[in-house]
Amino acid sequence: MAQNYTFTGSLTMTASSTTGYSASMSGSTTLNITGVDQIASGRIDCATGSDATIMAAPGVGRILYVKNMDDTSTLEIYEGASSDNDLIGVLKPNEFLFTIIRGTGTTTARGTSNAVTAEYFAVEIDSAA
């Protein structure tokens, strides 16, 4: 049965120089999501040469967060059931991707040179989101 959720996210970044100068930026957002049938979260090992499913095909689209937990290797994120589909992100070590995708393809990931652990969170959205 579909559920309704409120998603609240915030991000703060600070850059500091060796001379003592610093700059900060922050932002936040709240999104009410109705009719959610699918939520996926956790960590998954993404090997080279094979595709790991982050989220099965949703009805309309999804909110997606993926972080490359590896210290040395790159992670590729695809919109589709395999890496033969559209590439939507290339994450260097410790980088993350946060986006909304309006599409019904499965989200997959693959390590490029070594097996990579990905941390992920995906929520299906409806047409009103």
Whereabouts are the PLM-identified features?
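Short, surface-exposed beta-strand/strand-loop-strand elements in extracellular ectodomains
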Residues: 58-61, 67-86
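An anionic, turn-rich surface loop/hairpin at beta-sheet edges
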Residues: 81-99
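Short, solvent-exposed loop/turn segments enriched in Ser/Thr/Gly
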Residues: 56-62, 100-105
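Interface-prone segments of viral and bacterial extracellular assemblies
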Residues: 2, 32-43
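C-terminal interaction-tip segments
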Residues: 2-17, 112-129
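Surface-exposed ligand/attachment interfaces on beta-rich extracellular proteins
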Residues: 16-33, 45-59, 82-83, 113-114
